[in-house]
Amino acid sequence: MEKSVKKVMKTTAILLLALIFAGSPAISPITSKTTIEAEASAKSDKAVKNARKCYYSTRKNLRRYKKVRNGSTSTDYWSKNKLVFSEIKPDKRDFLSIKNTVCEYYYSKSKLVFAFAYQKKGRKVKEYRAYYMSGKCYRYIGPDKKVHTYGSGKSYERMSGMAKKLYQKGNHNIQLAYEANEPIGNK
């Protein structure tokens, strides 16, 4: 009986030590870094999910929105007093347009959440997609179809290329849209 008690105590001590060391970030294979990565992944997934929800809802309800043309290349869609969607076609005279690129901006609660842009050259189409949340870019897909996911998001200063250009133009667009439509009660 004494041997079995010692064996149980030894096993208990080993299990207890294993539990203690498993919780230690220095020794545990599951460190705080993987926790941070998981949280970052959850944020980027949330940004993409919100953008998709906004995109599908906007496309579904497009005919219900108030359509306002701003010049020959820009069309805004309003739901009550909120801008929900803008389409900007290429025009050398329009500083909001991007050369040879049709841009679609999707807004939720007056914030840019998704930008879709495309360039047509003959039969070839180049597409760009950028997913935003809280002023940061969480995912970008360029014409090479390569998905760039930024777990903790990229601020405007750290964005590059088309993701940065779309963010800048999309935010400038919403500011101008609210200023232009203030007199008719859309602000």
Model-identified regions with their sequence ranges:
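Bacterial N-terminal signal peptides that target proteins for export
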Residues: E2-L16
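Long terminal segments
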Residues: S41-T73, K121-K187
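Sec-dependent signal peptide cleavage junction
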Residues: A22-A42
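A detector of low-complexity, intrinsically disordered, Ser/Thr/Gly/Pro/Ala-rich segments
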Residues: M9-K10, P29-K33, Y56, T73
